[in-house]
Every structure is written in structure tokens, then in C-alpha cells.
Amino acid sequence: MSKRPTIAITSGEPAGIGPEISIRAAWELRADVKSILIGDAAFLAMTAAAINPAIRLSALSLQAVRNSGVPDFSRDQIAVIDCPLAAHVVPGKLDAQNGRYVLQTLDIGIEGAQQGWFDAIVTAPLQKSTINDAGVPFTGHTEYLADKTNTAQVVMMLATNATPQPLRVGLATTHLALKDVAAAITIDSLAGILDILLADLQNKFGIAKPRILVAGLNPHAGEGGYLGREEIEVITPVLQAAQAKGFDVRGPYPADTLFQQKYLEDADCVLAMYHDQGLPVLKYASFGLGVNITLGLPLIRTSVDHGTALDLAAAGLGQADHGSMLEAMRIAAQMAAAARTSS
């Protein structure tokens, strides 16, 4: 890349694998990405030294960045915006005292993206229970980012470049009980989701004319109404409205046949109706290299597709695979480049 994108990495739950995989990925991609870790500078420096003594971290104060922006630094350095821990970290052992610390790192990432310090945010995994135990109601990264940026509707996408061509799967619903899915899919909600997908595929992925395949909700896409009428009464009218505006959206297709190469090679994204309809295929195909992307935000955010892995953290450094973090950073960099071009 001619210009290294500046990417902030929130280091996640300090007792998990987030700090390690963040440092490893940032160091590996230092030639192509200007990485800014957000977390406790002393703790991250200690972790980096244990991973590889050659890794060089450069600490920045938040106030200095607010005053002057992110300074230039060499390609053999990783910057850290210091955000002090509340309590000593024991790998693999959660401490609610550090719950608010995790949110502070997110707040800095959001502030920096909105102020133009960063081109994108990549989030390492956090532990929801620790934040809730700290007295802060918290349901997840996505909801927190939406709330902090005053975004009414967001779309969860999983993506991977580990397949013959990029595979992107957007979700019409996310972490919702299966019995509640049908009621959650309305004409208004689905139209909004499709609008976000189309806009972000254009503006954040650089796809001028996105091609979207849409899955049905019911087996066999409803079998003409015999197995459910959501395809007839909700999904098809939304697709027809988008098609009337000139967009290439197709469906609804039976989900059990949609994920075939002959269909995917002629598409930029699949829209699945619920979590376990679309994600098993992607997770199987991605070989652990899936990336979680939040669309609809006024910033670029990607994340790993796994959790804090406290057991691996407790076992010591070198146990965790940082492949998903590498892909999250690469896709964030690609999106940042596309966003610069489209703006």
C-alpha cells in the first residue's frame, strides 16, 4: 500500500488472548499498517517483550493525541495509546475491576475514528460478563458502538478471504432466539438492512454495483406459501422495491442450495435471515479466518470471529492463533482504502 492506513486496535479483555493476538498481528503487518494499540502501555509492553524482544512499542498519552493527533513513527514500531488498568492482570482469570477499563479502550477507539485519528477500528475479544459485573449493562461490541455513535440500525456481517473468492454474509437478525426470528423480520427492518448493505458495499468495499443474494426464511424458501408466507409477504416485496431502484438483489433462495459456488461466484454478498442459517457455512469455509464486520456505523469496525479463550491465555503465550486478527486487520485496511477512494 502506498499509504499505510492507521488502524486502532482495542486490546480487549486483558486476561484473555486479546493483548497477545493484537500485538502479534500488529507486528506482522507493520510494513503495511500503522497500528495503534489501545490499552495499558506497561502491560502491553511487558506482553510484547515476552512474545518477542524485538517488538518495539511507543507509548502515547491520550491527551497528546487529542492535542496533536497521532504522530508519525517508523515501520518498526507499534504505537500504544495508554489507558491504565484498574487491577493487576492474571492470565485466564477475570476481574470485574477491569470491566470499565475495557469500555474505556473502546471509547478511545470510537473517539479517534470519529475525530479522524484512525481510518478503522479493529476490536479484540472482550468478556461481556466482566463488564456487566462491573455494574455496566452491556450486550456486546455491536450494540455499544451503535449506541455511542447514535446509529439507529446496524448490520452484522461475517466475511473471509480464505475462500476461492471473498465470501461475505450479512444477517437480517443476529443473537435472537429462533422462535422470535420471523416476527423480527418486517418490511421496514429488512428494507433498512438492505439499504445499509448496499451503501456499505459501495462506500466501504468499493463495489460500484453490489450483487446480493437473499436467502428465504423457511425451508425451500416457503414452497410457494405452503411452508410459510414470509417470503411472499415480506422478503419479495422488499427485493422488488430495491430492484425497481436498479439494484442487483436476487431471491429469496432456499438457503440449503444458495451457498453453492455457481451462485456465489456471481455475487458480492449473501443476506441470511438468521444467525445459524448463514454463519455455519462461512465458519466452515474460512478455516478459522472469519472476520466480524459491523455495517451501518459512521466508521469502519472489524473484529475477530472468536472469544477471549481464557483457557489458552492461562496456558501461557504462544497457544493462541492470531490468524483471525490478521484477517480483521487486512480487511479493515482494504475497507479504509476503499472508503478513501469513494469519498
From Swiss-Prot:
A GO MF term: 4-hydroxythreonine-4-phosphate dehydrogenase activity
Organism phylogeny: Bacteria, Pseudomonadati, Pseudomonadota, Betaproteobacteria, Burkholderiales
Assembly behavior: Homodimer.
EC numbers on record: 1.1.1.262
Protein's pathway: Cofactor biosynthesis; pyridoxine 5'-phosphate biosynthesis; pyridoxine 5'-phosphate from D-erythrose 4-phosphate: step 4/5
Root EC class: oxidoreductase
Entries under SUPFAM superfamilies matching the protein: Isocitrate/Isopropylmalate dehydrogenase-like (SSF53659)
Gene Ontology terms: biological process: pyridoxal phosphate biosynthetic process; pyridoxine biosynthetic process
Binding site for substrate: 141-142, 283, 292, 301
Top-level taxon of origin: Bacteria
Other remarks in the entry: The active site is located at the dimer interface.
GO CC annotations on file: cytoplasm
Entry keywords, A to Z: Cobalt, Cytoplasm, Magnesium, Metal-binding, NAD, NADP, Oxidoreductase, Pyridoxine biosynthesis, Zinc
UniProt-recorded name of the protein: 4-hydroxythreonine-4-phosphate dehydrogenase
Gene: pdxA
Cofactor: Zn(2+); Mg(2+); Co(2+)
HAMAP family documented for this protein: PdxA
Residue sites binding a divalent metal cation per the record: 175, 220, 275
Annotated function: Catalyzes the NAD(P)-dependent oxidation of 4-(phosphooxy)-L-threonine (HTP) into 2-amino-3-oxo-4-(phosphooxy)butyric acid which spontaneously decarboxylates to form 3-amino-2-oxopropyl phosphate (AHAP).
Catalysed reaction, written as an equation: 4-(phosphooxy)-L-threonine + NAD(+) = 3-amino-2-oxopropyl phosphate + CO2 + NADH
Protein family per UniProt: Belongs to the PdxA family.
